Amino acid sequence: MRNVRVTAAEASRADGVSPMDGVSPVDGVSPAVAGFPAAGASSAAGVSPADASQSGTLQSGTLQSGTRVAWAGGGELMFEARGLVKRYQLGEVEVLALRGVDFLLRSGEFVVLLGPSGSGKSTLLNILGGLDTPSEGFVRFRDHDLSQGDDDLLTHYRRDHVGFVFQFYNLIPSLTARENVQLVTDLAAAPMRPEEALELVGLGARLDHYPSQLSGGEQQRVAIARAIAKRPDVLLCDEPTGALDVRTGIVVLEAIERINRELGTTTAVITHNAAIAAMADRVVQLSDGRVASESRNAVKAAARDIQW
């Protein structure tokens, strides 16, 4: 990597987290803080993220029209959230973003959180990702209570265990695709090579291109590569296709699909686009801060077969 200077605001985007969140991946938190296992060393039950797809947690097979057998369960419980309430105070007005949400997510699962704007999707995802804490209730990541975590614990948790993908890419304009990913891999304990991560999302031939030389879909795939290069336990995606046209959005969904399938990365995607729900193992519908319904897809649609 060439010697490049970046500002503090740019550095805070290196892990896909907006500078508005006040999260910096270069804040000096020790990899052994708060009792979490070392990043990338192993996942629970001794299964590495790279081996997860071979562990029996995922059961898949090729069906006609490119569909795949849905996740069959059996993975460890990665997230348990109970009774989540989130209040925001806007002047004298109290806004309830979540109203008693229960949510479980198991290792290797692909879940779509579906609902209109204001339904609580992003608030729930932010709490799962350690970007926010609930006003009431609790959320556990494995054996760790994130709802009681201090800033050091949550910063370490985000940096070593969670990959974020947002609607906006947050790439550093002065760095190439490879260098944007390497900002994260330089901080992780057992990362992929940047080239490997970019190859996974179909950008092996675009390593040395700058964001301005990439299309919107390609920039989003760089953001996905950056998110998964540190081998996170979970990939959290907030409207990853929201700024893209249908054709480009499908390519981005194929990248997310491949990461879940080949790496066994637990994946949660929030969207207002009901068509995307067809590619999930499980679909959770939110409305007015509550879980309105939950269903499973017996057979998952391939991303390339989705139309909207």
Name what the model sees in each region.
Residues L77-L286, V291:
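ABC family nucleotide-binding domain
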Residues M1-S43, V47-R87, S293-W308:
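ABC-family P-loop ATPase nucleotide-binding domain
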